[in-house]
């Protein structure tokens, strides 16, 4: 692979959904590659068949496509260093592990599960951290060959140096050193011949020419072992960028198991993909310089200004209110046509009668923060809800149930006029305004009761004349007459 070009990879496991933290890793990995005019690779890590979920690979593909994080090499489009699915690369890992055995940097371990369980139980009883005791680390070559020939089950373990320290540099966390004596002889190849996650990871990253590894800070503790593998093979170590965890609050990590929202959940609730991506980028990263105060960024803008130096060491707290505010800003920036296209599926969930959707959307857009909250605002269109006439009382508008009856009776002939075009909102408003002036009243005195009469609610997507134009003349007149009757009650 060319050594001067940045190559990054997003390597998810197909477990069924896209965590917010996973999507952030994918985004940072994409930005790192694209900012440097490099290559973004998708690799599916499916060696843990116990956690594999049918259809999960499609979730990964769909999420990345929806968010615009398009890969340059991957399982579906191929590339020069495929296959890009780990389970399709099985044949190559064992030969690398056996190479380390031949060089004295790894060894065959024949310890049974029972022995290891007893060892760990004893260590726990003594208040020790559980670890492998090196029982098979220095077996004579003849004994190893004899046991292999007899078909005895084995794993291959990495021979970690017992002395010295292993250090590495991380872009976010700086220089980190670990005493080799504190590291376990990790398993590289399991008894079934499958590689462990850590081993496959290192081999694949090398063979795919990965230059920058971006992942969660939970992998910091494994990184010295990764580096010892790179050193054992004589391979170039990539640049490490470890990201802080995404937290629900100060104590708890964001977790799907605890019912916290995945990317799919957020979209299903009516958050815009672009807003979610924008917000996720700011979870633990902040722009520098002239962009330091800016919060709204398109994906091309993020590519342009990206720098891993902006990643914080501190855990990022997922703030639903902040996401809401960013989503509301994205909604406000949509063209009226774009908003209507996105809002209509939500409108159709609540409204099954004929209404002026264009006018409804013009009223919804400035007020809407999350698309999924649209249906609950529109439940009065299909059927008039029960309401109490005390709702007509409003100090600001100087209305009471008594004045409301007077106002609605004054409006009835105005709204009944066949010459009045309900398709022209301004014309309807001007006609109502003229009636208010004729009565010597303010507009609100007349129009606040109209809104209640048409919706049975104090908060609606639009004022009285807007609602009348959305519903049309027939429904408007029927509801105004029903309201007058109710007030006569």
Enumerate the language-model features and the residues they cover.
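Residue-level signal for inorganic ion chemistry
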Residues: 29, 60, 100, 104, ...
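Structural motif
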Residues: 18-20, 266-274, 313-319, 352-360, ...
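N-terminal Rossmann-like or analogous alpha/beta NTP/dinucleotide-binding catalytic cores
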Residues: 2-125, 222-235, 275
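Charged substrate- and nucleic-acid-binding regions of tRNA-handling and nucleotidyl-transfer enzymes
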Residues: 426-488
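Small-residue-rich helix-loop
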Residues: 336-439
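Glycine-rich phosphate/pyrophosphate-binding loops
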Residues: 34-46, 199-212, 233-247, 461-466, ...
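Conserved phosphate-binding loops in nucleotide/dinucleotide-binding enzymes
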Residues: 83-87, 110, 189-190, 208-219, ...
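Active-site cores that bind ATP or allylic diphosphates and position pyrophosphate for catalysis
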Residues: 102, 107-242, 248-254, 262
